[in-house]
Structure formats: C-alpha cells, structure tokens
Amino acid sequence: MKDVIIIGLGASGISAAIYAKRSGLDVAVINFGMPGGIINTSSIVENYPGIKKITGSDLAFNLFDHFNSLNIPLYNEEVIDIIDGEIKKVITTKNEYKAKKVIICSGRKPKKLGIKNEDKYIGRGISYCATCDGNFYKNKNVCIVGGGNSALESALYLSNICKKVYIIVRKDKFIGDNSLIKSIQNKENVVIKFNTIIESINGVDYVESIRTNNEEIDLNGIFVNIGYEPSINILKNLNLKMDNNYIIVNKNMETSVKGIYAAGDIIKKDLYQLVTAVSEGAIAATNVFKSIKE
C-alpha cells in the first residue's frame, strides 16, 4: 500500500509527484497517455516564468525528465474507477492499487465537434492536436475549427507546413490575443471564415471535404480546437461535489471526500494555466504529507 497515488502525469501530476517524493512519502503515479498531458499540444509556450520560449513538447519532456530523475514508480495503465474507504482503491484495466490518499490530476480532454461521422474520421483526417499530427498534412489543405488562442496557435503552426489553412470560426471575430491575430492576418496561405460552422464531413475512407453553412471546401485535414472538457469517467463512484463537471476543492486541494485530493485542469477554478496547475499539484502533495504525518 502506498501513502499516495497520483492519477495523471500532466503538469499538476508531475508537480504533485515531485513534492510527494521529496517530502518522503511512498508515492506512485498511474498515467494513461503522453506524459505532460495537453502541454504537448502547445506549439509554443511563452508564459512560464524562467523560460522565455519553448515548444510544448520540449517542456513536457523536461518535466518528465525531472520526474524520472526521482525514480518514482509509474504505471502506464488506464484508471477506470476509484473506490473510497479508509484505504482508497484505484482500479485500472490491469490491476488494483491501494493507498491512504489519492490525488486526481486527470486533466481535460479536447471537445469534439459533435457532428455525424466524427469518430469515423479520427486518425483519418480529424485531429485534436496540430503539433502532434501536422506533419502528416505537409503541402495539403486543412482547416482549423475554433477562434481562441489554441486555434490561432495551431493555425500559425500549420501555415508553415500546409499548402492552405482555413480557420472556421463560429462567431464573427476571434477571441484570442491581438499578437496572434495579427500574425494570422499576415499569413498569405491562411483563409479566415467567420460566422461559419461545419455541417458535414465527406470522404470515403479519409476526409476529402467539408460542407459548411456557406459552401463546400476540399481539404484533407480537420484540426479541432474548440476547447476542453474535464476527464470525469473515473469519478462515477466517488460522489464528489462538482460544478459543471469540474471537481470542487478547498484551499488545500482536498475534495468533498476525505483523503481524495485533486489538482490541475480537473478542478473548478478561475484560471486554467500551466503555472496554476504546477502550483496546485504542489499544494495537494504538501497537504497530503501534513495529513499523513498528523
């Protein structure tokens, strides 16, 4: 049995693991997916103190490298349930793990478009990560769906790889940073489509075109950047207090269930940023340590 099990290895999970290990706790991490979480989807990170500019994938690598240096047990398994009790149980598709405390850092996942045949084309023209899959569309026509910073960053990244990049925006304007908007407007191979929604996706085995409310556009790739939603599948049996599917925590990062903590993008808060996720992971681990030692 462990002192604490951390679920997830994004920024908050890595931070929690580092602080737990350094405080002397017997800690293990369970993660399913890429270490670093959604940091990997950022083409460039420029707002993390001490690092002027770095790619998201490089920052994720650095965080994971720090984690690995501490020899913390890592189980690459998918968590399917958490069972409360004096001893907490974390159930994966392969094993059952026990701990005194649990820190949930499962983060968020990209929102889907919610249109017919979307799942059919995932990996066959639909992607939710430009930096992960952009190179598959070199010299091809693609579209970005979304009007915020992540969509603009993805469009800039793809404009250097793809022949033409359409930006499909539901509203009549962008809601991103002015510097990003200006950079987009200076790109000759970027076409902006305001007041536009995708109504259908067409193609036999792979994406060949999209039908919008205005026209049909021939393209090979659709990159969806319309925001994120919390990953809550593992929470079904915990009866946690929630707010719009986000976990409510107190100042110590403890949930409404004693001994269950949460940090990062899975919790209800005002600011969803890398720097806040790292802080919350540290706070959660520190308070787990205090609780166990008391």
Locations of regions flagged by a protein language model:
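Beta1-alpha1 glycine-rich phosphate/pyrophosphate-binding loop at the start
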Residues: 2-70, 140, 150-177, 287
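Glycine/small-residue-rich loop that forms an oxyanion/phosphate-binding "nest" at active or ligand-binding sites
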Residues: 74-136, 147
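Phosphate-coordination loops involved in phosphoryl transfer and adenosine-cofactor binding
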Residues: 1-3, 76-77, 138-140, 195, ...
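Conserved phosphate-binding and hydrolysis motifs of nucleotide-dependent enzymes
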Residues: 8-13, 107, 146-148, 264
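A Rossmann-like FAD-binding core segment of flavoenzymes
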Residues: 67-91, 96-99, 160-251, 292-294
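FAD-site-proximal beta/loop scaffold in flavoenzymes
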Residues: 114, 120-136, 226-276, 280-290
